A protein has these predicted regions:
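C-terminal substrate-recognition/cap domain of FAD-linked oxidoreductases
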Residues: 1-77, 84, 88
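Short, functionally important structural connectors and interaction interfaces within domains
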Residues: 12-14, 98, 123
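Short amphipathic alpha-helical interaction segments
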Residues: 69-73, 77, 98, 106-109, ...
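Short conserved micro-motifs on helix faces and helix-strand junctions that flank
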Residues: 20, 49, 93-94, 123, ...
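Activity-critical C-terminal alpha-helical subdomain
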Residues: 103-138
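Alpha-helix-loop-beta-strand connector modules within alpha/beta enzyme cores
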Residues: 79-81, 120-121
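A glycine-rich phosphate-binding loop feature that marks nucleotide/adenosyl-phosphate handling sites
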Residues: 1, 50-57, 95-105, 134-138
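Alpha-helix capping/hinge segments and adjacent helical runs
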Residues: 86-98, 127-131
Length: 138
């Protein structure tokens, strides 16, 4: 069933999928929070995932939102979802890792010092910037 949910969402509306993880005991709080954030910003969501490991796929549905509201409110809502996730002891990326999407929100999950360390490690192993260029660190 889980594999069918994403296809059903795709066939009904424009959507944006996020991938979060929280401790299993915090899943109810995250779900309730996602619904509350969506209500505040005018979007609905379909959530599913791997409850056994706390992974939650959040499909934010455009539905009837106009393009301006979708484009302006979406990143605010995602930021709030990620802030909630981290406040519950979770991470802003589950099984897919940090990439183009989460790059904008790394400040929520990592301190400036931690990001500097990550950039330093990347520069040691990839001084020419040819491995996975522009994905997270240029």
């Amino acid at each position: 069933m889980r594999r069918s949910v994403g296809e059903a969402v795709k066939s009904n509306s424009i959507y944006k999928e996020e991938d979060t993880v929280v401790p299993r005991a915090e899943l109810p709080k995250l779900l309730k929070g996602v619904k509350s954030i969506g209500k505040e910003h005018g979007f609905k969501s379909v959530c599913y995932g791997h409850a056994g490991d706390g992974n939650l796929h959040i499909n934010i549905i455009k539905g009837d939102m106009n393009d301006k509201a979708w484009n302006e409110d979406l990143s605010k809502g995602i930021r709030e979802i990620f802030e909630l996730t981290v406040s519950l002891g979770g991470t802003i990326s589950g099984e897919h890792g940090i990439g183009f999407v989460q790059k904008e929100y790394m400040d929520i999950a990592f301190s400036e010092e931690n990001i500097a360390i990550q950039k330093g490690i990347k520069s040691i192993f990839d001084p020419k910037g040819i491995l996975n260029p522009k994905k997270v660190f240029i």
